[in-house]
């Protein structure tokens, strides 16, 4: 067992696994949710999709849009229906060094991603896409003033003796906004309504690049399922319809770093649904009906999140909403690593420096495993002459050879798996840290120093990948080897080149982590080898 072969093969397996997992996320992000839909409640889940136009007619032309501005959001709201048709994230730029804000929601030629809400039911005013209410507003723009913590944007509509007030409530520093319907029934008859709220987006392929694909599609949460993706492909295959028996859950459209989500107000019997109309996909919630007697009033409300994937803030808005920051199956390791990274950054003030500090902490914590690995391999190397003599003496008798090898290991107190086991135990930490860095919106457009202006983007001059490849080459040269096969030697020599090519396209934050990890490996390797030599365990 030699360290060079083990380290590089494990690293190759790790990168291959991560690339394959990312490809799987993009191509087949979630299995069909049939079983989950059936298990979410013993109650039937009637499909809300049947209430609205199965094939909507011509969408109404907008009478006008109003602009709503806070410190973190700039929204455009269509006065026809009162939908959010545009959302700028004021504190996130569209591109590095750009003054233009990142646009999350928009309704443009060829691309639609909007947040719709309305009232349906027997007396619903939003049942037809071609006959939605035209709301009246007191101004064309609303702005959160200095010293003001809350901004209310009321829109009114009256029909058949019923007064409707749809109000958007936004708060300073928050990406969560409330949508409230206040309905006053003076029609002389009972009126029944239920509120719906969904996100609509063009069906499209997953985002990202070939080397770093990212998920773009639907996701939801119920009492039985904390978090589940429901891709555009899933929506096209089957409309989702889940009854939320306790009313808790949410429906979202997510993409790399950002998300939009509707959260109902914990009303038992809420229906979570998807539907596809042409090239558009909807995912949302439909709250149960309320009957309003004449002369009475009622309120309907839901919360809309539109912004970056900020775990702490999202967790405060709704249970499990923070899980849209998807760390994969090793989330229980990745989440604490991200928290530690953010904690370090709060002191050092630079995400690149925080990554370096975190790498030293992680590798320091794994030092006992690393030391055990090199010690075991040194002991195995000391046994090579005895093992070779044993092979020559026994010949092709594999059973006898195996028995005598085990006796030799027992006599010399050597664990033949000691060199591999520490590497296997380290792999989950490496994978979890990869996802923690990959999913952190905080790294987006965050500079390190010099030529690295964005840790979430690839190195523009490929300096970090080249340094990383050089560090792998040094590790390979410093590691003693027992490989004698010429083909294996060529493969081992070629591995740093192959890894360098892979990392040319990786975000520089990830490459920085791997480079620093290799440097720490070189330091630890040198110290461990010197200590082993003093003990008489030769490493060469």
From Swiss-Prot:
Gene Ontology molecular function: membrane insertase activity
Record keywords: Cell inner membrane, Cell membrane, Chaperone, Membrane, Protein transport, Transmembrane, Transmembrane helix, Transport
GO biological process: protein insertion into membrane; protein transport
Species name: Vibrio parahaemolyticus serotype O3:K6 (strain RIMD 2210633)
Residues that span the membrane, as ranges: 6-26, 342-362, 417-437, 455-475, 496-516
Name this protein carries in UniProt: Membrane protein insertase YidC
Organism phylogeny: Bacteria, Pseudomonadati, Pseudomonadota, Gammaproteobacteria, Vibrionales
Family, similarity comment: Belongs to the OXA1/ALB3/YidC family. Type 1 subfamily.
Annotated Low complexity bias: 36-47
Function: Required for the insertion and/or proper folding and/or complex formation of integral membrane proteins into the membrane. Involved in integration of membrane proteins that insert both dependently and independently of the Sec translocase complex, as well as at least some lipoproteins. Aids folding of multispanning membrane proteins.
Annotated membrane topology: Multi-pass membrane protein
CDD domains: 5TM_YidC_Alb3, EcYidC-like_peri
Compartments in which it is found: Cell inner membrane
């Amino acid at each position: 067992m030699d360290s060079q072969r083990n380290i590089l093969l494990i690293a190759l397996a790790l990168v291959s696994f991560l690339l394959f997992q990312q490809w799987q996320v993009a191509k087949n992000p979630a299995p069909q949710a049939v079983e989950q839909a059936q298990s979410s409640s013993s109650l039937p889940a009637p499909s809300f999709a049947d209430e609205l136009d199965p094939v909507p007619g011509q969408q109404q032309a907008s009478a006008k849009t109003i602009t709503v501005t806070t410190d973190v959001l700039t929204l455009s709201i269509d006065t026809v229906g009162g939908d959010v048709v545009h959302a700028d994230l004021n504190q996130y730029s569209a591109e590095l060094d750009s003054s233009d804000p990142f646009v999350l929601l928009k309704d443009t030629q060829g691309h639609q991603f909007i947040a719709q809400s309305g009232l349906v039911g027997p007396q619903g005013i939003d049942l037809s896409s071609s006959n939605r209410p035209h709301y009246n507003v007191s101004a064309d723009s609303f702005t959160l003033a200095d010293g003001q913590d809350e901004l209310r944007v009321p829109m009114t509509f009256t029909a058949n003796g019923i007064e409707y007030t749809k109000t958007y409530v936004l708060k300073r520093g928050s990406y969560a906004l409330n949508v409230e319907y206040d309905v006053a029934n003076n029609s002389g008859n009972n009126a029944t309504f239920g509120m719906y709220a969904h996100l609509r987006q063009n069906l499209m392929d997953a985002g990202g690049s070939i080397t770093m694909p990212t998920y773009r599609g639907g996701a939801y949460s119920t009492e039985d399922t904390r978090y589940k993706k429901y891709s555009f492909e899933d929506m096209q295959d089957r409309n989702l319809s889940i009854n939320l028996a306790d009313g808790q859950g949410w429906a979202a459209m997510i993409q790399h770093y950002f998300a939009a989500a509707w959260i109902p107000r914990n009303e038992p019997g809420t229906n979570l649904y998807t539907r596809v109309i042409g090239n558009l996909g909807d995912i949302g919630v439909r709250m149960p009906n309320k009957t309003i007697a004449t002369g009475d009033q009622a309120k309907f409300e839901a919360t809309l999140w539109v912004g970056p994937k900020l775990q702490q803030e999202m967790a405060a808005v709704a249970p499990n909403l923070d899980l849209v920051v998807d760390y994969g199956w090793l989330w229980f390791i990745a989440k604490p690593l991200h928290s530690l990274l953010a904690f370090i950054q709060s002191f050092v003030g630079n995400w690149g420096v925080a990554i370096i500090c975190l790498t030293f902490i992680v590798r320091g914590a794994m030092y006992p495993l690393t030391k055990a690995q090199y010690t075991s391999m040194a002991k195995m190397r000391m046994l090579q002459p005895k093992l070779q003599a044993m092979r020559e003496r026994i010949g092709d008798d594999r059973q006898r050879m195996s028995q005598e090898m085990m006796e030799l290991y027992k006599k010399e107190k050597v664990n033949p798996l000691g060199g591999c086991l520490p590497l296997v135990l380290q792999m989950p930490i490496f994978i979890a840290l990869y996802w923690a860095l990959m999913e952190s919106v905080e790294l987006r457009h965050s500079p390190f120093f010099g030529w690295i202006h964005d840790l979430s983007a690839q190195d523009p001059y490929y300096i970090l990948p080249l340094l990383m490849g050089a560090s792998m080459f040094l590790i390979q040269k410093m590691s003693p080897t027992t490989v004698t096969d010429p083909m294996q030697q060529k493969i081992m020599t070629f591995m740093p080149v192959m890894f360098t090519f892979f990392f040319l396209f990786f975000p520089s934050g990830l490459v920085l982590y791997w480079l620093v990890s290799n440097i720490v490996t070189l330091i630890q390797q040198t110290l461990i080898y010197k200590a082993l030599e003093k003990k008489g365990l030769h490493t060469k």
